[in-house]
Structure formats: C-alpha cells, structure tokens
Amino acid sequence: MSAPTLPQETETAPAVASAVPGGSSAKTWSVGTLTYTTGGLILLVVLLLAGDFAWSMRERSVFPLFQVLLRKYEASDLLSSLLLGSIPACLTVLIWPVVSVWSDRTRSRWGRRIPFLFLPTPLVAGAMVGLAYSPQIGVWLQQLLGGTGNPKLYILSVFGLFWILFEVFAMVTNSVFYGLVNDTVPRVLIGRFYALFRMASLGAGVYFNYSLIGYAESHAKEVFLVIAAFYLVGFSLMCRFVKEGTYPPPPPVVQNDTFFAKIGRYFRECGHHRFYRLTFVTLSLASLAPVAVNLFSLYAAKSYGIETDKYGKYLALSYICSFVISFPLGWLADRYHPMRVASTCMAIYALTMVAGFFWVHDASTFAVFFIAHTVLSGCYGTASMGLYPMVFPQAQFGQFFSAYSLLFNFLVFGASPVLGYVLDLSGNWYLLVFAISGGVGVATVVLWVFWYRQFQAGGGVKGFVPPAPLEARE
C-alpha cells in the first residue's frame, strides 16, 4: 500500500486504489475530484480536526471572556445583547452572503475555500490582541481626551471597536469553513466526521471552561493573548496543508449586472423552491432556540449566586457529557439519517427548557437545567451538522448555507435587543430565557413536520436529491 498521502485529484492521478498483498485493492473514498486512501483520509481528518480545535478555542473562549468583561465594566443587558447578539448578526447579514458566493465562484491554485480561511486569520488574531489591551487603551484614550472620573465608558467603547473588528474578520472564516469540509470529506463519512469535529470543539470548550475561565476577570489580557497565538498557529497550519480538489467552472457572470440585480438573483436562486424556503426557516428557528439561554446564562448564574469559576466548571461538565455522546450521535445520524436524529434532539431540548422555566428556583436546579441546555442543544448541533450537505446543492453549498445563516442572523439581530430590553424591564428576571428557548424549540418541531413531508417527497432518507438550482432548471 502506498504511504499515507493527502487526497489526489483524479484528473492528474487517475488511480483510485492502491495494490495490497493478495491481489486485492485498498479501499478508497472519493468526493469530487479527490480520492483518499486510508492513510490519506486519516491525515485529512487530523489536519481538519487540528484546525477545528484552534477555531473552536477561539469560538469557545472569546465570547464568554467578553461576557465577563462586559459585566465587570457594568454594561447593561441592552448593551450586552447588542454587542453579543445584534451587531454580530448584522455583520453576518452583510458579510456572509458576499463571501460565500465569492468563495463558491473562486478558482485558484489554493482552491476556493483556503484563501478565505488563511488571509483573515492574522487579522482575527490581531483583533483578539486589541481586546486584550482594551482596558489600557481605554484609560489612555480618556487621558488623551481630557476625561475624568470612571473610565468604563472609554473602556467599553474600545472593547466595542475591537469586538466589531474581531467579528468582521472571524465572519469571513466562519462563512467558508464548513464549505471546506463539504468539499473535502466523503459523503458516506460526513456524520461521523462532524461528530469528531464536535468532539474537538467540545474538547476546546472543556479546557477553556475548566482551566481558564476562572482567570477571565483577573488575567483577561493574558488569556486573550494565549488564545490569539494558539489560533494563529493552529489554523494557519491547517490552511497550509489541507489540499482542495479541482472544480468545474462557475456559471458565467452576467455582464453589466447591477448590485441590486445580483442581490435579486441571489434570493431567487436560494428561494426558488418551497423545499429550500422551508429549510431556511426551520433550520434558522432551530439555531435560534438556544440563543436566549446562551446570551444570558452567565448573568443568570450570577443571579443565583454562582461565581464565574463554578459556572465554568458546570460548562466544562456539560461539554464532557457532550463529548462522550458525540460519536454515537454521529453514528446514529449516519445510520438513521440526520433529519430524524436532529429533529428528535430538538424535541427533547424544547420540552426540557419549558420544564426548566417551571422548575428552576435556586442554584442547584439552575445548574441541572443549564447543563441540560448545553448538552441537549449540543446534541442537536452534532446531529444536524451532517444535514446541511444533504439538503443544499453541492455546487452552491456556500451560497445556500449563507442564505440559512442570513435568515438566522436576521432573527438574532431583531430578537436580541428586544430580549435585553425585556430583561432590563423585568428587573433581570433571567428565568425568562428558559421559557423563550423552549417556546422557539416547540415552534421548530412543529415546522419540522411540514419540512419532513417535503423531504420525503424529494426521495426521503433513502434517496433524497436536493432540488436543482434555478440556473439548472432554466
């Protein structure tokens, strides 16, 4: 058998199997123009998981660090919801569709995804360095402008600036990362691969919340700097060594097309079929369900007397539970289809959150339902990861995935400040977040029934084929 190699492109390396003793052929896996031996597949998985671990350390750490610092400098719930929810959602609406379609159409020597992952990476790390030094910059800015008194307004302003820069650059990588997986991982392994992805992400979450979050208030600068360096090195190495295949030419560009004509065509292509419209709404509601608890769980914990370090331990415990069940969930998704497994997980999550609204009354019961929230929403996330490549057309995966993300973030953009305002009016009655997440989950399950009927009409779990893109139908 040949030595472990990265995938070979079938146009330049026609052989798809390596000889093994006894005259048989080694098993291979293919996706697009890429063909993997066992060794090549293992190497791909290791590289992608290493990149995902670095990416997850960024995703799992920066958000809670920023939450802690916003509370430390006395940001209101409304301001927190704007910075943590609405502004990132607005940026997603503006950036994600443009970058994803641009990536779908890109043809370069490095592929169509890697350039959009590698180039923003140092900028993301730089924004994290800016967040690390925001308190010092805020104090310096106050002195420069001749301000007096508490510098928290200046510090929060600098935090907001670097947070927005961080979100802009991170959004570019987020918009195409799953596209890289879609283009390089064989379909027959997608459920188990995403389970491994989930395990890497959870491992990053366990490490951060068990070991580092307790230092968020006292050593935030050092934590930011370490994570920035780790992300810069780890994600860059993945971009350097993962190889994409070759792609067919993109559809021709319409000459003299105006900006608004391009927007109109984007929405026509994504929404031309009822199945896709139901897909976008159902998946967006499913992703929206945990948002209320996610945004305010740390503040809710503090309202029950739970300190940041203990909150981190609860979060780490929930990630350990999720880690243990991730691969079995991936196997179940491959065996019974992500459509079935993900909907079951969402139904259980919705009922549990509704129960939490009625039963949480002290620190212990909050801990139980908070851990349940994290584990069950994670179960849905793990089970649904393999669903996206199955319900969106592969050639335009980035575009269709961005349409789902656009709708989801539009909902977050509108809902986050309303939620923050309601919590401010209620006197910070954080128990409401369980009712809201549970209610959105119930609505998702109801809508999923209609979506599943459309899915069955298109071939179901045995032979579903995504409806043809509009250009193919025309």
Which stretches of residues belong to each language-model region?
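Juxtamembrane intracellular "pre-TM" segments in multi-pass secondary transporters
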Residues: 16-40, 247-279, 466-474
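Helix-loop boundary and gating motifs at the non-cytosolic
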Residues: 23-91, 275-304
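Intracellular juxtamembrane helix-capping segments at the cytosolic ends
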Residues: 66, 172-185, 379-393
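Glycine-rich segments within core transmembrane alpha-helices of 12-TM secondary carriers
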Residues: 88-93, 191-213, 405-416
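Helix-to-loop junctions at the C-terminal end of transmembrane segments
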Residues: 94-110, 216, 325-338, 423-424
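A membrane-interface helix-boundary motif in multi-pass transporters
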Residues: 112-115, 149-150, 214-229, 421-441
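Structural signature of the two symmetry-related core transmembrane helices
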Residues: 113-130, 340-355
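Multi-pass alpha-helical transporter architecture, strongest
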Residues: 131-138, 233-242, 437-469
